């Protein structure tokens, strides 16, 4: 591959500052505080409707927002630090994507969900939704980790966030599906979007960088930090925007038990599939989280604790099997280079979660939900749909998510192939020193080795 220029001195400032300038202008024109964060409107409501400060939605939602925010910036960031020479980039590019993504998604989701009287009204719930949208982009980032420049990642974020907003609006508002924890809108969409981008950006000579694609002892320990943070806070992620009361309570419980069961299944299958009965840290770091994905759609439904445990067990099994057998096939046969294995942690468990949601919706009755049907399945509650119809619409939503992911990934992949974004060469992948000042002179030495190992005819 020829013609590479990884120097970010002009490219990165232009993209970062220009996009931030545009975002600020759009915020100035369109974005306003919602009625619970606007000083005049909130105090008028307190005076006219005898509302207390303690009833402000901030106090109900902010604890969940904190947990979700930690997942986005620490959980996802450190989960990707397993690469031995890519720790700076894993954490910091995650930081960059999330910082831009949450601003852009505030605008995109605001146009679809919070646009009134020509303005976007934002509050604590819109901040949570912006983090959710960013989570989908970070999942896609995992599929192309180590093989893209920061400018490519910013461009991917810009377009993917826009497509996420459209996809989410269609699924939730037009199809009328339920997906509070994002099995379809976040995990399935983000995973398959990233996989298709990775396929379009396929590198024939990635073997030149394979020696850096693995982990070392301390990098796997750092990645486990991300795993533990994600595992602890996933109940908040799935329940953050569900209705107050029993819905949120039930979602936390279902996620809690699903994750626990998934972890045991992961340990068991990891040892079972190893000829010497040893555990694989890749499985523990990733597959143990699949239980949270698997109940993203059904978490607020009457899944039952044992049903959540079954879902988690299945997710753990599927994820470990995927890492062991499917990832190599995707690489060798389908030419999909999935660095983090997002297909196994988010893709397949996301589809499983969508199917579980469709099955549970099929059995939604007034006897089971009572008056709670209005919160969980409002279209069944008001007679617009039967449980069978809701189940079919849940399945249709999965197809919509997959369709947007595949088509969107194709378009974005071809855009990112343009030679102006400073992508690393095949011999420079998975290497921090390409884009970072690495302390102690280590970066210069390592980059010299990288360049010297590259064939002469591939030099820019």
Swiss-Prot record:
Instruction: Locate the transmembrane regions by residue number.
Output: 11-31, 63-83, 88-108, 126-146, 151-171, 180-202, 221-241, 253-273, 284-304, 306-326, 348-368, 395-415
Answer yes or no on keyword Membrane: yes
Where does the source fall among the domains of life?
Answer: Eukaryota
The listed locations are: Basolateral cell membrane; Cytoplasmic vesicle membrane
Reply yes or no: does the keyword Transferase apply: no
**Which positions are glycosylated?**
48
What InterPro entries does the database record attribute to this sequence?
A: Ammonium/urea_transptr, NH4_transpt_AmtB-like_dom, RhesusRHD
Give residue spans on the Extracellular membrane side: 32-62, 109-125, 172-179, 242-252, 305, 369-394
Which stretches face the Cytoplasmic side?
Answer: 1-10, 84-87, 147-150, 203-220, 274-283, 327-347, 416-460
> Which GO cellular component does the record give, naming just one?
basolateral plasma membrane
Q: How does it sit in the membrane?
A: Multi-pass membrane protein
Keywords on this record? Ammonia transport, Cell membrane, Cytoplasmic vesicle, Glycoprotein, Membrane, Transmembrane, Transmembrane helix, Transport
Extract the signal peptide range: none
Q: Name one GO molecular function term.
A: ammonium channel activity
Protein purpose: Functions as a specific ammonium transporter.
Similarity annotation: Belongs to the ammonium transporter (TC 2.A.49) family. Rh subfamily.
Q: List the protein's name.
A: Ammonium transporter Rh type B
Species name? Xenopus tropicalis
- Print the organism lineage: Eukaryota, Metazoa, Chordata, Craniata, Vertebrata
